[in-house]
């Protein structure tokens, strides 16, 4: 086992990358092979038989999909590569967003027979949002239907990307025999089954013309991105390979191009050149712009990737660990941190001590003495730190940009089977919601039930599974419930007056407020229009708090209210009797009064559903979607497959996975993400409200 500890590499030799893909594109296998060839792992794991290193949670081993982004470190040609494994299933896009925040670059893995699939589009858009430079790997070149040029074209058509193949395959499907490097103009062949022996040789005659044509394409595309190459190209001068690589690296880091590689990870072909590509084209922390942060005065500060700067890091993942309690994963942006020292959590305003620092290798771990700028590391000992918190040096407190997390759309009631399970359940739910900000757990005060909510049925299934397995807590599970919301349609004003006089000090709070509908994507806004101090400044936050709390339970059916702007217009106070509590109660009275007059309505989550199906099942699937109140937007053809894009209310989608399987004999697949909230039809709303 090569010891990583001693090898603190120079920053320019560090790569922090993610491997992102659609659920079946072979991402885990690609990661596995990377670990194998970089000497971190002595037997080749396979998803199909459940031995893959990165998929280390039991549930992942059974389902064959990656759920938790484990961070792994490995060495290749005296560079250190930190890999963050990201899930490909749409219910876990939160994990993907989180990983993308702390990466410098990514490898996008595609299935060469399918090209860009729906989830690849989602993940690609998220990577665009965080400006993550990417290279692409067309995997599964040995699969039936593999077509390199078609797959590359889908990157243009569906992702609006600028793919530049730096390799082409020799053959495809059964006859896939290796790859051609279009920059060096050499063929690469693998001599043994596990792919450890490879040779560079002359390009076979039958591929020569195609390779020359594709190299010409490559030169043309690179010339468009680089003035120096453009000049040489137009003058017909020789363009050196180093110059091509340099220009391509610059374009990749600026997100103007995506170099494309190909191979078959499962057949152990193409992985070492992909590793070279990670070093060649993806950025080191030094190539990235400085990270932005804000100091205590709210002024922007630039955080430079240097060991000499004060320490700054972002916690991007909390993982409950059966052995050590809680692991906090963070990315160090500047400075250096020794184990046993204190860090300042500027988000919470608290000091915490780090007892151990660990480099993770999927589910094995190595203790290290210190970490520094660029590192991705797990720490033990941080009790109060949550996902998205900034850790820094107390002498230079700074807050990095906050992470934003989506609201859950689906809930189920769960109850412990025995009294003994009750205590275990509340502890486990606390740990799980620390770990995953898109998962919520709370007790419904009216019914006394424990409600858990998340991003989809699979998300909650996995949570329930973990409760049983990891936390040994037996629970009974109710039917999934839709997370409805309520809102108002018209502006309304109301007065809230709370006065109590009962011996000694009284209570006095008085507000006049206006409530207006705003865009439903915004939960709540508050505006203070008080002039002349008719309500003193110190009570204003209590007014906002009162409205926020009241908005948690709407007037129609007790669902949280969204899309409301609260404006505090006027009011009065009493020198002695006024208190924060009195203003909080007065504000909630005004809110409840106004909402009744503002034409409240019930809202439901509308999901963007994309079904991919062989043509022969399309008619039945569309008929079924229509029976679910769907609005079918578009139909697309992709080879022999049809893609149906529709908007469907979530309440109609329960159990859809099973129904779709029976409609298509298991051949159709679908993805579903929240699009927006919309008004529930009146008849249905009456039913929901009467419940």
Swiss-Prot record:
GO terms for biological process: ribosome disassembly. InterPro entries: EFG_II, EFG_III, EFG_III/V, EFG_IV, EFG_V, EFG_V-like, EFTu-like_2, G_TR_CS. It comes from the Bacteria. GO terms for molecular function: GTP binding; GTPase activity; translation elongation factor activity. Residues 12-286 form the tr-type G domain. SUPFAM superfamilies: EF-G C-terminal domain-like (SSF54980), P-loop containing nucleoside triphosphate hydrolases (SSF52540), Ribosomal protein S5 domain 2-like (SSF54211), Translation proteins (SSF50447). Keywords: Cytoplasm, Elongation factor, GTP-binding, Nucleotide-binding, Protein biosynthesis. Its main location: cytoplasm. It is found in: Cytoplasm. GTP binds at residues 21-28, 85-89, 139-142. GO terms for cellular component: cytoplasm. Pfam families: EFG_C, EFG_III, EFG_IV, GTP_EFTU, GTP_EFTU_D2. The keyword Nucleotide-binding applies. The keyword Electron transport does not apply. NCBIfam families: EF-G, PRK12740.1-3, PRK12740.1-5, small_GTP. Catalyzes the GTP-dependent ribosomal translocation step during translation elongation. During this step, the ribosome changes from the pre-translocational (PRE) to the post-translocational (POST) state as the newly formed A-site-bound peptidyl-tRNA and P-site-bound deacylated tRNA move to the P and E sites, respectively. Catalyzes the coordinated movement of the two tRNA molecules, the mRNA and conformational changes in the ribosome. Belongs to the TRAFAC class translation factor GTPase superfamily. Classic translation factor GTPase family. EF-G/EF-2 subfamily. This is Elongation factor G. It comes from Thermosipho africanus (strain TCF52B).
């Amino acid at each position: 086992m090569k010891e990583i500890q001693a090898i603190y590499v120079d920053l320019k030799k560090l790569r922090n990358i993610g491997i992102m893909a659609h659920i079946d594109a072979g991402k885990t296998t690609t990661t596995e092979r990377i670990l194998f060839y970089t000497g971190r792992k002595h037997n080749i794991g396979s998803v199909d038989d459940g031995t893959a290193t990165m998929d280390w949670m039991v549930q992942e081993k059974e389902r064959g999909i990656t759920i938790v982004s484990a961070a792994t470190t490995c060495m290749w040609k005296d560079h250190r590569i930190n890999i963050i494994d990201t899930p490909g299933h749409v219910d876990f896009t939160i994990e993907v967003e989180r990983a993308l925040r702390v990466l410098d670059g990514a490898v996008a893995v595609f299935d060469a027979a399918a090209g860009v699939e729906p989830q690849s589009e989602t993940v690609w858009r998220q990577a665009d949002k965080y400006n993550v430079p990417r290279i692409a790997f067309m995997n599964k070149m040995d699969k039936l239907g593999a077509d390199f040029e078609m797959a590359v074209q889908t990157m243009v058509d569906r992702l609006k990307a600028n793919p530049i193949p730096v390799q082409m395959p020799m053959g495809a499907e059964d006859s896939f025999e290796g790859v051609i490097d279009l920059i060096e103009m050499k063929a690469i062949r693998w001599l043994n089954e596990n792919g450890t022996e490879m040779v560079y040789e002359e390009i076979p005659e039958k591929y020569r013309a195609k390779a020359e044509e594709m190299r010409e394409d490559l030169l043309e595309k690179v010339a468009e991105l680089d003035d120096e190459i453009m000049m040489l190209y137009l003058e017909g001068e020789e363009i050196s390979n180093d110059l091509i690589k340099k220009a391509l690296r610059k374009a990749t880091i600026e997100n103007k191009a995506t170099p494309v590689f190909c191979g078959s990870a499962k057949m152990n072909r193409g992985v070492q050149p992909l590793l070279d590509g990670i070093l060649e084209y993806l950025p080191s922390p030094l190539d990235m712009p400085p990270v932005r942060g804000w100091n205590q005065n709210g002024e922007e500060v630039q955080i430079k990737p240097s060991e000499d700067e004060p320490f700054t890091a972002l916690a991007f993942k909390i993982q409950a660990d059966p052995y050590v309690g809680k692991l906090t994963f963070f990315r160090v942006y500047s400075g250096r941190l020794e184990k046993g020292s204190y860090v300042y959590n500027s988000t919470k305003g608290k000091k915490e001590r780090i007892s151990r620092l660990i480099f993770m290798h999927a589910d094995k771990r190595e203790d290290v003495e210190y970490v520094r700028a660029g590192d991705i590391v797990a720490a033990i000992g941080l009790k109060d730190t949550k996902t998205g918190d900034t850790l820094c040096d107390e002498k230079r407190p700074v807050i990095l940009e906050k992470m934003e997390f989506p609201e859950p759309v689906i809930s189920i009631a769960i109850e412990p089977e025995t009294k003994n399970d009750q205590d275990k359940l509340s502890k486990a739910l606390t740990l799980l919601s620390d770990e995953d900000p898109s998962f919520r757990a709370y007790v419904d005060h009216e019914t006394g039930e424990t409600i858990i909510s998340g991003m989809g049925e699979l998300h909650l299934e996995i949570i329930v599974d973990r409760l049983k397995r990891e936390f040994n807590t037996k629970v009974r599970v109710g039917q999934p419930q839709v997370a409805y919301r309520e809102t108002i349609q018209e502006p309304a004003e109301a007065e809230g007056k709370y006065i109590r006089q009962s011996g000694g000090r009284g209570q006095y709070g008085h507000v006049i407020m206006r409530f207006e509908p705003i865009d439903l994507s915004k939960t709540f806004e508050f505006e203070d229009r008080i002039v002349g101090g008719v309500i003193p400044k110190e009570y204003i936050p209590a007014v906002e708090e009162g409205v926020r709390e009241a908005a948690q339970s709407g007037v129609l059916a007790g669902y949280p209210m969204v899309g409301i702007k609260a404006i505090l217009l006027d009011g009065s106070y009493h020198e002695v009797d006024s208190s924060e509590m009195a203003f909080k109660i007065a504000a909630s009275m005004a809110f409840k009064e106004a909402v009744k007059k503002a034409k409240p309505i019930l809202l439901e989550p509308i999901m963007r559903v994309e079904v991919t199906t062989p043509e022969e099942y399309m008619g039945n699937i569309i008929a079924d979607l229509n029976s679910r109140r769907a609005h079918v937007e578009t139909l697309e053809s992709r080879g022999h497959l049809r893609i149906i894009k529709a908007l469907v209310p979530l309440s109609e989608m329960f159990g859809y996975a099973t129904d779709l399987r029976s409609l298509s004999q298991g051949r159709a697949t679908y993805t579903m993400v929240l699009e927006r909230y919309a008004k529930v039809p009146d008849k249905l709303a009456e039913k929901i409200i009467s419940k």
